[in-house]
Amino acid sequence: MTSLRKTHPVLKIANDALVDLPTPLNISAWWNFGSLLGLCLITQILTGLFLAMHYTSDISTAFSSVVHICRDVNFGWLIRSIHANGASFFFICLYIHIARGLYYGSYLYNETWNIGVVLFLLVMMTAFVGYVLPWGQMSFWGATVITNLLSAVPYVGDTLVQWIWGGFSVDNATLTRFFAFHFLLPFIIIAMVILHLLFLHETGSNNPLGLNPNMDKIPFHPYFSNKDLLGFVIMLFSLSLLALFSPNLLGDPENFTPANPLVTPPHIKPEWYFLFAYAILRSIPNKLGGVLALLFSILVLMVVPILHTSKQRGMAFRPVTQFLFWTLVADMLVLTWIGGMPVEHPYIIIGQMASILYFSLFLVLFPITGILENKALQWS
């Protein structure tokens, strides 16, 4: 008799995605981060749901309600700490997941990759509106500065900003709508994740060698389900460690002060996971130019498949491209460091050099190196 999981209309879908999914034999630990992102998303939605039960989206009580959650709600301090630090882990997994896709040429699955880039933008938007909710100093001023960037849009900019604010400044209407968006967006992300997986399972997973693995596949369960489980344990342990021992390590001290429109913090900066994009934004001394650079720093990922010139898929056997890849990683770290620094010499010029290198790697150096490596293969 055929198992119920193979015949039941609903269970069959889950079975084909999680149990009997043919998976390349040789995928490494870098392929764990997709499932880790799923775990992060579920963790964030569950902790967020419990926080939303006690949070009030009103400027007079928002800050106090967060204090109330930490002091009076059963394990409220833990739920908030996991939610705040879970966002950091979400982005760590996200950046590693994208880096894996770049390194092994997974971006050649066009639909999966492009949906992934849209997911990246949605997660960034969710994190940004969520950061505003505790209504601390950096929350307020971060919201003011970032939403103000839209005023750089020609002709409709100022109207657009007032429309998003719901008034002439970041105020109660802004906080209320940001809470609504922060609650809604994760569910849109879930829908996009399902699409992401749908397109991935049309082609099957890529593998470290970049070769067609169809002749050498094994079922996802029990092999990779157990491997994922180990990843879950490591990540949850690391998250617990951070949330319990250093819950404020990655936060901004300014957020311990309630939002005050009359006092500007000395250095306005976003959370650490946005600093690289913030550095690119600041490296252009023109408002519209900076906004476009900020936008293209993410959208440049969409042109990666178009600019793929190599005859090999991944970077496993392409040492020069590997060197460029690690240069990109180092460049991202430099940009992250610069994003958190004040706008003064020598940080300005370092940020500008790092920004030029960032776009050069994607748009010029990777494609040219691919062509040169093809030539080298012909000569050998």
Curated annotation (Swiss-Prot):
Misc. remarks from the entry: Heme 1 (or BL or b562) is low-potential and absorbs at about 562 nm, and heme 2 (or BH or b566) is high-potential and absorbs at about 566 nm.
Biological processes, Gene Ontology terms: mitochondrial electron transport, ubiquinol to cytochrome c
Record's function text: Component of the ubiquinol-cytochrome c reductase complex (complex III or cytochrome b-c1 complex) that is part of the mitochondrial respiratory chain. The b-c1 complex mediates electron transfer from ubiquinol to cytochrome c. Contributes to the generation of a proton gradient across the mitochondrial membrane that is then used for ATP synthesis.
Keyword Isomerase: no
Subcellular location(s) of the protein: Mitochondrion inner membrane
Disulfide pattern: none
Listed name of the protein: Cytochrome b
Organism whose genome encodes this protein: Danio rerio
GO cellular component annotations of the record: membrane; mitochondrial inner membrane; respiratory chain complex III
SUPFAM superfamilies in the cross-refs: a domain/subunit of cytochrome bc1 complex (Ubiquinol-cytochrome c reductase) (SSF81648), Transmembrane di-heme cytochromes (SSF81342)
